[in-house]
UniProtKB/Swiss-Prot annotation:
Protein name, as recorded: Ribosome-recycling factor
Role played: Responsible for the release of ribosomes from messenger RNA at the termination of protein biosynthesis. May increase the efficiency of translation by recycling ribosomes from one round of translation to another.
InterPro entries: Ribosome_recyc_fac, Ribosome_recyc_fac_dom, RRF_sf
Sequence similarity: Belongs to the RRF family.
Length: 185
């Protein structure tokens, strides 16, 4: 049976990795992705609403997104929201859809994105290590209070370290995958 402390640590580490993965999906890579628009909201009858809840977003060709709102009166609001965002893209509105064309990124832009990816992944690693630190601190406290033996403490510390190594490795794989995606031409 797995110790409850280890279960909780693993769950927290897994959630940290998942959060980093989600954050990386939103990072621009030069390749169009509907996830880039998830954070952009428009005013929909007085309520800030994500674009993906009022329109269909499709990837077309190699470097463009087509945003087709369910109500045509939202076209200009979507266009303005994208222009106001930090995506650095210029939407075109043809009366039916909003088209986002992604220009080929320069090598400098790609390097900047890789650097940003590395920062995001590093935050994930720090989170995983902080979880390890908290668990080890808790184990030492339990040993001090006589709840577990020193042998159990050492065994559990080793297992926590193994979990940490596993999730750090997962984060490294996420980075490598994203870096490869960014550097593709």
């Amino acid at each position: 049976m797995k110790d409850p402390i280890l279960k909780e640590a693993e769950l927290r580490m897994k959630k940290s990795v998942e959060a980093i993965d989600e954050e990386l999906k939103k990072l621009r890579t030069g390749r169009p992705s509907p996830a880039l628009l998830e954070e952009i909201k428009i005013d929909y009858y007085g309520v800030p609403t994500p674009i993906n809840q009022v329109a269909t977003i499709n990837v077309t060709e190699e470097r463009s997104l087509i945003i087709k709102p369910w109500e045509k009166n939202l076209l200009s609001a979507i266009e303005k929201a994208i222009q106001a965002s930090d995506l650095g893209l210029n939407p075109t509105n043809d009366g039916n859809v909003v088209r986002l064309v992604f220009p080929s990124p320069t090598t400098e832009q790609r390097q900047k994105w890789v650097k940003k990816t590395k920062e995001i992944v590093e935050h994930g690693k720090i989170a995983v290590r902080n979880i390890r630190r908290d668990v080890i601190k808790e184990l030492k406290e339990m040993t001090k209070n006589g709840e577990i033996s020193e042998d159990d403490e050492k065994r559990l510390e080793k297992e926590v370290q193994n979990l940490t190594d596993k999730y750090i490795e997962e984060l490294d794989k996420l980075f490598e995958r994203k870096e490869k995606e960014i550097m593709e031409f």
